[in-house]
């Protein structure tokens, strides 16, 4: 017969497991495990296909295990502990942020939740309007109402956001170009992105010409300006070439 202590043990273990589980950064741990499993699978396949070199590979593998094994046993928990520490810091930051968020912002959030809750009521009212006036008239009236209400705010938001977005894009591009192999990948990806941007611009322009007012919310991608910005950035980051004197 199980004692009271035995029955309580799973509960204690579960509590410990919950404490060990990361609250915010669990996706980092999951990604690391996934990467490790993929690497192990690739390594195992490569070793199986190494043919005559397999004994040499296994010999090197054994030597590496002999040297690295003690170091791994000593330090393998360090990354996990660092991740736990960072997770706690994130938790503290979120708690502090929640404490400092102005009541007005929380009120707006509550209003958004209330709006989501009354969405079914709005949907029923809309269905009634469709039955009364027809699909086309109802949709047209809604589009005009939404357009007149949100067009100024949308354009102002885009005008303020666009320069910051360009600045962030250039900064990210500069950092990515410092990574190994990225410039080579970019030579393939950039022309594709440029082609997609041109197709997008062409589609928006043609839709506007046909009278689709929704295209007013779809700003064109400034391909020429982006090309100019990245061309200047590339010129600034290119290494200087030194030629020997004759």
From Swiss-Prot:
Residues annotated as carrying N-acetylalanine in the record are 2
GO BP terms: namely: developmental vegetative growth; lipid droplet organization; lipid storage; positive regulation of growth; positive regulation of response to water deprivation
The reply on keyword Zinc-finger is no
Q: Does the keyword Transmembrane helix apply?
A: no
Give UniProt keywords alphabetically: Acetylation
Task: Tell me which GO cellular component terms the UniProt record holds.
Answer: lipid droplet; plant-type vacuole
InterPro entries, A to Z: REF (IPR008802)
> Which PANTHER family does the UniProt entry name for this protein?
REF/SRPP-LIKE PROTEIN OS05G0151300/LOC_OS05G05940, REF_SRPP-LIKE PROTEIN OS05G0151300_LOC_OS05G05940
Q: Which family does it belong to?
A: Belongs to the REF/SRPP family.
Record's protein name = REF/SRPP-like protein At3g05500
